[in-house]
Structure formats: C-alpha cells, structure tokens
C-alpha cells in the first residue's frame, strides 16, 4: 500500500428479561403438558393444548406493542407448529410463545395488539387457539419507552446466566466459539466478551449449520446444572435463529464495469477530507449474502442511496486499496429487493472485525475499521497519539490533520474507519490517512 497516496498532505432480545424465572419443568421435557393452575377467573372447560404445566390463565385484555417475531417452526418432531415473539407494555416486555399459526400476521413488528385469555408461565406468555388477539383500537395505542425496547434487545452476560437457578429459560444472542456434531445432537461453545458456556441442540428438532464466528440467537433454552457445570439444553419449544459471519472481500485495484448488487449495511456521516478544495465524502459498508465490502463514496448526493437496508447496484466504480470507490461517473441505482430480510436490521448483520491481537499478527499493511476503547492520550508535533484496547490487546493510534479536532478523551469509545495499519521497527500501529474518519461513540441514554 502506498503511504504517499494514503496519507493526507498535512498528515459496528436482552437483559434480565432475556432470561425468565425457572420453568416448572427444568428438564425441558414437560413444557407442553396440558395443565394450568386453578384460579377464580378460570373456566374449567378452557382448553390448555400446548400450554406449560403450572401456567396461569389471564382473561383480562392487555394491549402490547410487537417488537419482534420469529418465523414459524416445527416442534414435537415436526408434529406441531409455533413461533416466538417479544412484546412490550408501557412498563415491561415479555417473551411470548404462540401456538396458533393464524395469528402470525397479528404479530408484525411495531403493530399494537390486544391479547386476552392467554397464559403466563413463569413470566413467559403462552398463546394457543383459545386466546383472543386483535388489533388495538386507536384509543388503545400505548407508548412504549425506549429503555424498555432497548432492554428487550440486550443479552444477559454468560457469567450472570450461570448464577441463575437450574431450569431457567434463556434467551440471548451469542457468538459461536466451537462446534461439535454427534449422532443425536450438536454441541456449541458460545461466548461473549467475558465468558463461555456449552449449548446442546437436539438434532431431532432441526439440523442447523452454523460455524465458529457465526452468531446464534437462542430462544427458550433450559439452563441445566448437572454435575455442577452449567449448560444450556434445547427443549420442546427451543429455537435457534442464526446469522452467518460475513467475510470481508477486497476489490482489485482499477476500473470495474459491474453491476454489483449489494445491500447497504451502514454509512458514516458526510465529512470533509480536503479542506483546501472543500471536498467531502463518506464511507459505507455493503454486503452480498456471504461477504462484505468497504466503500468510499465521493459524491455527496448519494447519501440516501446508502440507507441501511437499501438494495443497490453499483456500476463503473474503481477498486482502491481493496475498497470500492464511487465517483462522479459511477452509477448507484436502487433495486427492488426480493428478500424481506434485506430491509430488516440490515445494519446489524454480523461482519468480521479484526481484533487487536489479529492486527499484531498481520504481515502487510492494510486498512482497518473498528471500535475501540481509549486508555491513553498524548499530544505531539501536529498529531495526537492514542492508546486503544479491546478484550484481546492494545495498540497505538496516531491521528493527524483534521482529525486532531475530534474531541476524544480517555475512557471514550471511538470508531475508526479507513485507518492504515503500518509498522515502525517491530511495532504495528494505526495512523490516519487522507480518507480516514473518526468519531466518538456516545452511550445511549
């Protein structure tokens, strides 16, 4: 990589509610037994098909906002269908098991619905054919606080999961560290930034194909503590929604006719990279089904094309340092997507990010994007030197030019885009280039 060309002339469903209190059947084999606790508001003839043992009937209507819903899937070895959902009121959110496939359309994201005659099993709502679900009337619409929605998306730390009671149902999003396939089951070791735990998936339910680095979203897994070692085990209602890790692809230098059809994942803000000529640009990340590309966009009027979720076709672009460069003669056109998931949470798709330990093992210069914590800051001659770290190590970053005006302090989390990985003697470090972008990530309120 040419330093001369790169350098400027001045030189990316779950908290405590992610789990639930222990189910009445901690083994996971009786969650669909047709029993319910008696109560003054219950009718003895109410059918309890598919409802968990000990579930309590609630006849009073409750208005909720639908946050998410999975696709229907087979359980009981393919004999029955169900899907999982997450809903919220003004004060809390709930995990929901829905056994009536006629209700799938009602459980559409952001839709307000009123439910009654549902069951509550240890904090999880269960809805079968006897429940009543209808669209909420205008005067029934509720306002769900952002912190409730945010909490529903958070994942409880594995270290905290291990402290819960045996039988607790676990929901969460985790990365795959290892995978082992047996005759009757698939065993994963999943991890977060601090810990790991084993997950056992019964192959009678679904044969899933996810590997190291992929992301798994677990629904209704049972925490077991046999022999004193916690594991997560699938039950009758368990479901896994996976996401394959997108590998970075590098475009060869020079002109490319195209078209290349991709989905926009995310984009930076527009920024000035040449203050003398007042030239602006932005960076974007786009992806196919299996790989992602970094894009440098030098045309201001193309910002709306790169809205996350948009399917676009790129033509007449250039390969530049492995990235795609879009200039005034390039063509970016919107394409009507045939994939419903393209426009759903596309900016959250899992892409491969190099950790600092990986950067130290590189053998040649390259461009780097990433988010890191700042632990050190010092000011030099026309530059600022930062010390950054992640959970694998630390590295030096040298910032010069316009990026020295970014208000970044020790303790901040920063996003670096298009920084050059280079070396001085036997030390690898990052430095800003002509096209680098840097911003401080503010915590959500």
From Swiss-Prot:
Q: Summarize the impact of residue 321 to R.
A: Impaired homotetramerization
Q: Name one Pfam family in it.
A: HIN
State what changing residue 150 to E does: Does not affect DNA-binding
Tell whether Cytoplasm is among the UniProt keywords: yes
* Effect seen on changing residue 189 to A: Strongly reduces affinity for DNA
Question: What GO biological process term is on the record, naming one?
Answer: protein homotetramerization
Q: Where is this region: Required for homomultimerization?
A: 82-89, 281-288
Biased composition regions of type Polar residues, renumbered to the chain: 1-27
Quaternary organization: Homomultimer; homotetramerizes (via HIN-200 domain 2), enhancing affinity for double-stranded DNA (dsDNA). Interacts (via HIN-200 domain 2) with AIM2 (via HIN-200 domain); preventing activation of the AIM2 inflammasome. Binds to several transcription factors, including NF-kappa-B p50 (NFKB1) and p65 (RELA), FOS, JUN, E2F1, E2F4, MYOD1 and myogenin. Also binds TP53/p53, the hypophosphorylated, growth-inhibitory form of the retinoblastoma protein and the p53-binding protein 1 (TP53BP1).
- What does it do? DNA-binding protein involved in innate immune response and has anti-inflammatory activity. Inhibits caspase activation in response to cytosolic DNA by preventing activation of the AIM2 inflammasome, probably by sequestering cytoplasmic DNA and preventing its being bound by AIM2. Also inhibits activation of the AIM2 inflammasome via a direct interaction with AIM2, which prevents the interaction between AIM2 and PYCARD and formation of the AIM2 inflammasome. Binds double-stranded DNA (dsDNA) in the cytosol.
Question: Can you name this protein?
Answer: Interferon-activable protein 202
Task: Write down the species.
Answer: Mus musculus (Mouse)
Organism taxonomic ancestry: Eukaryota, Metazoa, Chordata, Craniata, Vertebrata
* Designated gene of the protein: Ifi202
């Amino acid at each position: 990589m040419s330093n001369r060309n790169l350098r400027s002339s001045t030189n990316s469903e779950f908290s405590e509610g992610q789990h639930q209190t222990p189910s009445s059947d901690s083994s996971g084999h009786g969650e669909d037994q047709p029993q319910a606790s008696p109560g003054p508001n219950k009718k003895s003839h109410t059918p309890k098909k598919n409802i968990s043992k000990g579930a309590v009937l609630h006849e009073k209507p409750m208005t909720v906002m639908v946050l998410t819903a999975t696709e229907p899937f087979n359980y009981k070895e393919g004999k029955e269908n169900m899907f999982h959902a997450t809903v919220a009121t003004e004060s809390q959110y709930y995990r929901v098991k829905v056994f009536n496939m006629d209700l799938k359309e009602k459980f559409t994201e952001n839709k307000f619905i009123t439910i009654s005659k549902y069951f509550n099993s240890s904090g999880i709502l269960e809805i079968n054919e006897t429940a009543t679900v209808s669209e909420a009337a205008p005067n029934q619409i509720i306002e769900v606080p952002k912190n409730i929605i945010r909490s529903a998306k958070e994942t409880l730390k594995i270290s905290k999961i291990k402290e819960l009671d045996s039988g607790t149902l676990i929901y969460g999003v985790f990365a795959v560290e290892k995978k082992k396939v047996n005759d009757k089951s698939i065993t994963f070791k999943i991890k977060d930034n601090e810990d790991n735990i084993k997950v056992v998936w019964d192959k009678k339910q679904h044969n899933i194909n996810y590997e190291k680095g992929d992301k798994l979203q677990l629904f209704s897994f049972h925490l077991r503590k046999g022999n004193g070692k916690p594991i997560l085990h699938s039950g009758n209602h368990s479901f896994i929604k996976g996401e394959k890790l997108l590998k970075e692809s590098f475009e060869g230098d020079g002109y490319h006719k195209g078209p290349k059809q991709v989905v926009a994942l995310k984009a930076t803000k527009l920024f000035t990279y040449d203050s003398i000529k007042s030239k602006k640009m932005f960076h974007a990340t786009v992806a196919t089904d299996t790989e992602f590309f970094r894009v440098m966009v030098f045309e201001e009027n193309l910002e709306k094309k790169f809205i996350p979720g948009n399917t676009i076709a790129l033509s007449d672009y250039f390969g530049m340092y492995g990235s795609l460069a879009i200039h005034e003669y390039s063509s970016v056109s919107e394409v009507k997507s045939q994939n419903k998931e393209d426009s759903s949470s596309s900016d959250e798709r899992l892409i491969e990010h190099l950790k600092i330990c990986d950067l130290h093992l590189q053998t040649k210069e390259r461009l780097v994007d990433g988010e890191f914590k700042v632990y050190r800051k010092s000011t030099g001659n026309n530059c600022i030197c930062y010390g950054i770290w992640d959970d694998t190590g630390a590295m030096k970053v040298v910032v010069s030019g316009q990026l020295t005006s970014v208000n970044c302090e020790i303790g901040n989390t920063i996003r670096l885009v298009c920084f050059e990985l280079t070396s001085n003697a036997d030390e690898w470090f990052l430095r800003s280039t002509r096209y680098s972008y840097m911003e401080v990530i503010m915590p959500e309120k």
